[in-house]
Structure formats: C-alpha cells, structure tokens
Amino acid sequence: MNNYQKFLKLHGNDFPFLLGNIWDVQSANMFAAAGYKAIGTSSHAIAAANGYADGEQIPFETILRIAKQVTETVSIPFTLDLEAGYSGHTDGIIQNIEKLNGVGVVGINIEDTVPAAQRELTDAATFAEKVTTITDYARKKGIQVFINIRTDAFLLGIPDALEQTISRIKKYEKTGANGIFVPGIVSKTDIAAVVQSTHLPINVMCMPGLPGFNELGALGVKRISMGGFFYNKVYENAAQLAKSVLNDNNFSSIIH
C-alpha cells in the first residue's frame, strides 16, 4: 500500500485521525516520531516560520523545496495546504499539484476563498468547475492525490455559515474531490448537520470551543487538523524560555 492509499484509508476509519500540522523537516520528524499517522503543512505556520504573512505570500518554490525535504525525511503520508492554488489559472494550479505530487505529496487542501487582504468566498459554481477540471486531469493522468476542499464560511464569520457551507458542499461533492474541510466550525449541532449533508469525509480544525476527539468521532468527523495553533504554542513556549535564560542569568531553564 502506497502513501496515497494509506492516506485515503485513514479517512474511512470509525474514529477520526489527527493530522500533525508541520512547518519544516524538524516538526515533521517530531510528529512522525510521536506516532502520528499523517502530517500536513499549516499555511500559517510554514509562512510564519519563513518570515511571510499567511495568504500565499510565501513563494511556491519555497513550499515545494520544503515539501521535497519533508518527503525525503519522513515516510508517513504528507498533505499540503495549497491555499487557493498559487495561481489565478486552473492550468497553473494543476502544474503546482503535479510538482508537489512529483516530490511525494499525496494530498492538498484547496480553498474557496480569494487570497486577498480582505478575504471573501469565491463563487461556488465557478470554484466547483475549477476543482472538477483539476480532478478530471488527475484521474486521466493517474495522479494519486487526495483533494480536500476547504470551505471558509465559518472561518470568515458569515451570518448564514451553516446554510452556505451545506449549499457549497452539495456543489463540491460532485467535483470528484475526496474530502471537505470546514475550519472554524465548533458547534456540535452544526458539525452533525455538515457531516450528514454529504458522503465525503469531513475535516475540522482546532478552535476554541471545538468538542473533544471522542465527541467529534461520534458526530462522524473523519479528520482533525491543528491549523497554526500548535506552531503558535511551540513558539510561545520558546519565547518564555528565552526570557527565562535572560532574566535568570543562567541556563537552568533549558538544561533541566
């Protein structure tokens, strides 16, 4: 079984799997050593770790280089947050996916949000057509990549987020995509409604108020992501250590 097949299978288990969200080779090694079944980039974390703001500000070539380093180092399935695709044209997105798949990436997230200073949802029908073109191409060329559509109504705080999300999912599940990612959703009632609206596996993300993993499993969620929260906590803790060394005038805080 190759990594694509392993990754696909993870989405069919009764209990959701936890995705370790990485930003470099060291973080990838850390999650793999801890026993995680799969890893994936956080767009926020990988951008911040390299000195960029989120929202496709980090160059695609940098992401591709890091992806290659990761797949050469860890053996578990690796998926990548491609944001809106790093291209304004479908052909360009397809080329980017081919390049990533060529270095061993077996999944991508692609979002229905315009990557701009004021983020907003794209037209659902147009976006669905774009994804259909991508999945048709991948199927014809034998490219094994898990396409996870991220839909951002909850993340953007849209008033009718649940209705928007379900309406969009109905269009997106016809595209040939493999899964749906709904970051920002936390209500058990909303999560249950989204899960019940589609046959595709639902992915949720760490947020204040998100139910525990057992509850999410009971609701039918198949995949849980960390987003940038793990990265933020790592560097929050590191900042405290840096202050301790400076204030204590010794290294006791980092050698014990």
Label every model-predicted segment.
Residues 2-80, 86-226, 233, 238-240:
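Alpha/beta enzyme core
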Residues 1-12, 246-256:
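N-terminal charge/polar-biased segments
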Residues 226-256:
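Conserved alpha/beta catalytic core and glycan-binding cleft of carbohydrate-active enzymes
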